[in-house]
Amino acid sequence: MKEKVVLAYSGGLDTSIIIPWLKENYDLDVIAVCVNVGQGDDMDYVKTKAIKSGASKIYVEDVKEEFVVDYLYKAIKSEALYEQDYMLGTSFARPLMAKKLVEIAHKEQAKYICHGCTGKGNDQVRFEVGVKAQDPTIKIIAPWRIWDIKSREDAIDYAKKVGVEVPVTKKKIYSVDRNLWHVSHEGGDLEDLKNEHKEDMYFMVTPPEKAKDEPTYLEIYFEKGVPVKINGEFLNPVDIIDKLNTIGGENGIGIADIIENRLVGMKSRGIYETPAGTLLYAAHKKLESVTLDKYTYQYKKLVSAQYGELVYNGLWFTALREAIDAFVDKTQENVTGTVKLKLYKGNIKPCSVDTEYALYDEGISSFGESELYSHKDAEGFINLFGLPCKIKALKNF
C-alpha cells in the first residue's frame, strides 16, 4: 500500500499541477483537501478536477462560519492590520486551513502534507508553522522549493504537458487569493511599480468613479465588539460579511494598493479588495472611540499592531496570540451599540453613534461650567503639566 500525502488543494494553477507531480516524483497516494473559506469556487467542479488530475480522494470542508466566528471576529475586535494597511485576509485564513489539513492527515493516517506555496512567499511559513505547532511529526512537501518549475509561465507549460486544465493563461497571469474577507491580486504587470493597476481585475468592488451617484447610509450594530445587525436586521455571521461585501463593493469601498514587507525579506505589491472589512473596521473604530477610556484605547492600538504582525507572520498557534485575544476580549465588554456610516464613491463618513456605554458626556464636553470640571482647574493642571518645559527654558541649555 502506498503512503499517503494530504494536499492543500484549490483547483488553481499551482495545486492543479502538483497532483501529477507528486505521483510522478514520490509515488504517493494523493488525498486532496479543499478548505472552503468562501472563495466562491464551484466545489463540484473542484471535486471533479481533483480526481481527473489524479487524486484518489478529495475532501471539501465548508468552514465559512468557523472562519468568521473563530478568526474574523478576532480581526474585527482587535482591528488588526499589518503595516497599517493590510487587513490580513489571507493571513487569517491560513491557520484554519492548516488545522483542517492536520485533522484529515490524522484521519487518513497520512505521513505527509503538501502545499502549493511559492518559495518566496509568506504562506509557506504560515502553513508549515501551523502544521508543526499541531503535529511536529508530519513531514512537509513544498514543490516550489524543489521542482524545476521556476515561474508561473513554466507552470502553465507543465500543465499543458501533463494534460491538466488550469484557469490561467500567459495573458492573464495574476495570482488571486479569495475568501469571504477579501480578494488579493499579485504578480504579472503589478510587479512593475510604474504600472497603475487595472480596475478590470476587481471581483467585489466597483471602481469608485463608476460607483452609484447617490450616497448609501448604513447602520451596523455591534455586541461586545462583534457585528450582529445590519440596518436593524439580525443576520448570521456569514451573511453579515456577504451583505457588507455587497454594500461596500457597490459603493467603491475597500480597494488597497499595498507595498508590504514580506516575512521572508523582500517587498511585494498586492491589490486587495476588502469591502466588508473596511466598513467593519471603520464602524468599530468609531464605536471604540466612544466606549473605551483614553488609556485602554491608546494601548489597544499598540496591541492591534502587534497582533497584526503576529498573524501575518504565521504565529497563530502561540500563547502570545491567545493572551492578546484575552486582552482584546476584556476591552470589548462595553463595545456595544450602533454606528451609522455614509458611503459615497469609495469614501466612508461616520455619521452617528448610539450606545448606552458612551464615555462621552455632552455636559462635561461643552464649553460651559459643570460639577465635574471648572475652567479654573485648568490653570493648575497646565502649570504642573508644563513644568518640565518651563524648567528647561529657565536653565537655558
UniProtKB/Swiss-Prot annotation:
GO cellular component assignments: cytoplasm
GO MF annotations, alphabetized: argininosuccinate synthase activity; ATP binding
Residues where L-citrulline binds: 86, 91, 122, 126, 175, 184, 260, 272
Short name of any one Pfam family annotated for the protein: Arginosuc_syn_C
NCBIfam families assigned: argG, PRK00509.1
Family per record: Belongs to the argininosuccinate synthase family. Type 1 subfamily.
Name of the molecule in the record: Argininosuccinate synthase
Originating organism: Clostridium botulinum (strain Langeland / NCTC 10281 / Type F)
